[in-house]
Swiss-Prot record:
It is found in: Secreted. Keywords: Amidation, Cleavage on pair of basic residues, Hormone, Pyrrolidone carboxylic acid, Secreted. The modification Pyrrolidone carboxylic acid is found at Q1. One of its GO terms (molecular function) is gonadotropin-releasing hormone receptor binding. Stimulates the secretion of gonadotropins; it stimulates the secretion of both luteinizing and follicle-stimulating hormones. The keyword Chloroplast does not apply. This is Progonadoliberin-1. It comes from Ovis aries (Sheep).
Length: 61
């Protein structure tokens, strides 16, 4: 669990808050990546975060 994503260690969690946190992460994953070396925008075609997003979306459905 990572605090920067709104997840808090220990204790009970509200399921809606967890889903909201994962949906926020999914939005960040879909944003294009801007490399610092040049002015072009690169959209990563395969990312472990995309795999995680797909897994979480299948669990939410």
């Amino acid at each position: 669990q990572h605090w920067s994503y709104g997840l808090r260690p220990g204790g009970k969690r509200n399921a809606k808050n967890v889903i909201d946190s994962f949906q926020e992460i999914a939005k960040e994953v879909d944003q294009p990546v801007e490399p610092k070396c040049c002015g072009c925008i690169v959209h990563q075609s395969h990312s472990p975060l995309r795999d995680l997003k797909a897994a979480l979306e299948s669990l939410i459905e």
